[in-house]
Curated annotation (Swiss-Prot):
Gene name per UniProt: CPS1
GO MF annotation list: ent-copalyl diphosphate synthase activity; magnesium ion binding; terpene synthase activity
Keywords: Isomerase, Magnesium, Metal-binding
Role: Involved in the biosynthesis of ent-kaurene diterpenoids natural products such as oridonin, miltiradiene, eriocalyxin B and nezukol, known to exhibit antitumor, anti-inflammatory and antibacterial activities, and in the production of gibberellins phytohormones. Catalyzes the conversion of (2E,6E,10E)-geranylgeranyl diphosphate (GGPP) to ent-copalyl diphosphate (ent-CPP).
Catalytic activity: (2E,6E,10E)-geranylgeranyl diphosphate = ent-copalyl diphosphate
Any one GO cellular component localisation term in the record: chloroplast
Pathway(s) annotated for this protein in UniProt: Plant hormone biosynthesis; gibberellin biosynthesis; Secondary metabolite biosynthesis; terpenoid biosynthesis
Protein name: Ent-copalyl diphosphate synthase 1
Organism the protein comes from: Isodon eriocalyx
One GO BP: miltiradiene biosynthetic process
Binding site for Mg(2+): D277, D279
């Protein structure tokens, strides 16, 4: 599916097809349609109730606009009178329902398009009711929109009104043709372009429409192409569904394609556009930055008004929830000093929080299964704290598959973005991973009991939470060794810390414990050591490290025992000073096999890499602060960060610096991206533990580890 991406897979718009069908052939002789196949499409696609529109979702805005346009087209050519009458009957019966429709779901340009169609219908003596309260509201909105972008402006610079020219009177076409897109369209709108062709007979308009009518067998979409939109949103959906690892080459090509079309002013849904929007720009910025491309945050200055508000399009009449949602998500990848993203984060978060408080999370661009759930998760769990399996588990309940429908000039479908195949595969993949995690959890419990770790202060609740954090962060079945090494390392660190602290061991006793470990022999612990209780815990540590080392030796032919032991010796000798993150990182990198390229790098080689040492220092620093924050939270009982997700200014600043170190790349850099990602993975797990209260964590554990996706 991803390999076949071109200009975009998208459903047909009866409204736009009707405008194309209205175009007359100027070849001379008798009056005839320029595109007869469009009339054939209209006659073949009337719904049973007499309307035209999306068959899967009933929106009165969509049905009225599509139906009136198709009736106008058929009446204009005096064909299929029975279909025309059936369409008129539908409108007479349902026009009053415009009053009941939620205005947030009004199609793009509806307030301009419908009045224009009604004027044409009156000239054709089509009898439809026009004195409803809802229609009067539509006419009022039309005046507001036209006043926001005065006629002189729309003839001078590209604006979104180029997308909705159809039916507008008094246009100066000699000026508008200078604003035509490279492909011959007017802002990629078939209906607007069809109207322009009627008025100008421009060859570029004719070529654009001819190409797409041929491609779509007589019909046309509400907008085309949608190449950037499709490339970006398909990748976003696959990532959030937890499926991106299966499509890495295709995803990398998608992102590279978007990068080739990127401009300093941003992008819109299609390449080579003279108009940009914040929604596509924010999604593009976020995914490009995540994949290591250099993109400047200054792009968002083009979407900020003098009053400090962010907008999607200049002259917009309403603000889209999803536009602000994607701006908020993009802002969370800010680097140090990117003040424009600080402003964007504040503005978008405030907008979304107000919408949520008013129970008003409806969007003007999409009707989706659970937009309030998506927005709520983003607000409640900031990206730094969002563990991969947690995000995926929630998104599996929010993603609507085939049922999600987009709102353009009409309702439309994007099958490469929203489809049940993605959903079914994601559910199967998640449940398979979860089953493996549950089996691993059973084995962890057996290991815990056989080692008597409870006697040293490790509780079963802490055991579960520790394994859960590892499994939610490194979830892939093929990474079982890394996941179990993370979990057991974290469990043993907590057990030893508990033993040292709560048993109130003297300095000499702690030194004896460390010395015994440093001079270990696996045979030594067969029948216990000199101090049975202490030796039991040392023996567990020794046996665990030997087991982990043996796994890697058998799987990859590498002996990691000594560097793994060295990492533990360093932690034991400085455990009071922190160092948990460093031990987890060294363990994860030793177990991971060198990253995606699976080219193993020794500890010595990694330590000599300047980028590795930068990452290590940054991660240790921020994780130590997060652990300190978490302990103060537990001890002080206040344990909440404020509503914007801020712990301290210092922590947020250091997280931004770490993100920059991880996601930026240079041509000379030889540090594998997967190794780099390990640093951010560990830091985000620490942030999660510091950010979320215990009740939230318990809820996540139950949902992620034990609640099967149905």
């Amino acid at each position: 599916m991803l390999q076949s991406m071109g200009d975009g897979e998208i459903s047909i718009s009866p409204y736009d097809t009707a405008w194309v069908a209205l175009v007359e052939d100027d070849g001379g002789g008798r009056r005839q349609p320029q595109f007869p196949s469009s009339l054939e499409w209209i006659s073949s696609n009337q719904l049973a109730d007499g309307s035209w529109g999306d068959a899967g979702t009933f929106s009165i805005f969509d049905r009225i606009l599509n139906t009136l346009a198709c009736v106008v087209a058929l009446r204009s050519w005096n064909i299929h009178p029975h279909k025309t009458d059936k369409g008129i009957w539908f409108m007479k019966k349902n026009m009053c329902r415009i009053d009941e429709e939620n205005l947030e779901h009004m199609p793009i340009g509806f307030e301009v398009a419908l009045p224009s169609l009604i004027d044409i219908a009156k000239k054709l003596e089509i009898d439809i009711p026009t004195q409803t309260r809802g229609l009067q509201e539509i006419y009022a909105r039309r005046e507001i929109k036209l006043k926001k972008i005065p006629r002189d402006i729309m003839h001078q610079v590209p604006t979104t009104l180029l997308h909705s020219l159809e039916g507008m009177a008094g246009l100066k076409w000699e000026k508008l043709l200078k604003l035509q897109s490279q492909d011959g369209s007017f802002l990629f709108s078939p209906s607007s372009t069809a109207f322009a062709l009627q008025q100008t007979r421009d060859h570029g308009c004719l070529k654009y429409l001819t190409n797409h009518i041929h491609k779509f067998n007589g019909g046309v979409p509400n907008v085309y192409p949608v190449d950037l939109f499709e490339h970006l949103w398909a990748v976003d959906r696959l990532q959030r569904l937890g499926l991106s690892r299966y499509f890495q080459p295709e995803i990398e090509e998608c992102i590279a394609y978007v990068h080739r079309q990127w401009t300093e002013k941003g992008i819109c849904w299609a390449r080579n556009s003279q108009v940009e929007d914040i929604d596509d720009t924010a999604m593009g910025f976020r995914l490009l930055r995540l994949h290591g491309y250099e993109v400047s945050a200054d792009v968002f200055r083009h979407f900020k008004s003098d009053g400090g508000e962010f907008f999607c399009f200049k002259g917009q009449s309403t603000q889209a929830v999803t536009g602000m949602y994607n701006l908020y998500r993009a802002s969370q990848l800010m680097f140090p000093g990117e003040n424009i993203l600080v402003d964007a984060a504040r503005f978008s978060a405030n907008f979304l929080q107000l919408k949520r408080a008013n129970n008003d999370l409806l969007d003007k661009w999409i009707i989706t299964k659970d937009l309030p759930g998506e927005v709520g998760y983003a607000l409640d769990v900031p990206w730094y704290a969002s563990l991969p399996r947690v995000e995926t588990r929630f998104y599996l309940d929010q993603y609507g598959g085939d049922d999600d429908v987009w709102i353009g000039k009409t309702l439309y479908r994007m099958p490469y973005v929203n489809n049940n195949k993605y959903l079914e595969l994601a559910k199967l993949d998640y449940n398979n991973c979860q089953a493996l995690h549950q089996q691993e959890w059973q084995n962890i419990q057996k290991w815990y009991r056989s080692c008597s770790l409870g006697e040293f202060g490790m509780t079963e609740r802490s055991l579960l939470q520790t394994y859960y954090v590892a499994a939610a962060s490194v979830f892939e079945p093929e990474k079982s060794q890394e996941r179990l090494a993370w979990a057991k390392t974290a469990i043993l660190m907590e057990t030893i810390s508990s033993h040292f602290e709560f048993q109130q061991l003297s300095r000499d006793q702690k030194r004896a414990f460390i010395t015994e470990f440093e001079h270990d022999s696996i045979l030594k612990y067969t029948n216990g050591g000199r101090y049975k209780r202490r030796s039991s815990l040392v023996g567990t540590l020794v046996r665990t490290l030997n087991h982990l080392s043996l796994d890697i030796l058998l799987a990859h032919g590498r002996d990691i025992h000594q560097p793994l032991k060295n990492a533990w010796c360093k932690w034991l000798n400085s455990w009071e000073e922190g160092g948990d993150a460093e031990l987890l990182l060294r363990t994860l990198n030793l177990m991971s096999g060198g990253g995606r390229r699976r080219r193993w790098a020794s500890e010595e080689l990694l330590s000599s890499n300047p980028k590795h040492e930068q990452l290590l220092k940054a991660t240790i620093g921020v994780c130590d602060k997060l652990r300190l924050f978490q302990r103060r939270k537990v001890q002080g009982g206040n344990g909440c960060m404020n509503a914007t997700g801020i712990t301290t200014v210092e922590i947020e600043s250091e997280m931004r610096e770490l993100v920059k170190l991880v996601v930026t790349r240079s041509s000379s850099e030889d540090l594998d991206s997967e190794i780099k990602q390990n640093f951010l993975t560990i830091a985000r797990s620490f942030y999660y533990a510091a950010y979320c209260n215990q009740g939230t964590i318990n809820f996540h554990i139950a949902k992620v580890l034990f609640e099967k996706v149905l």
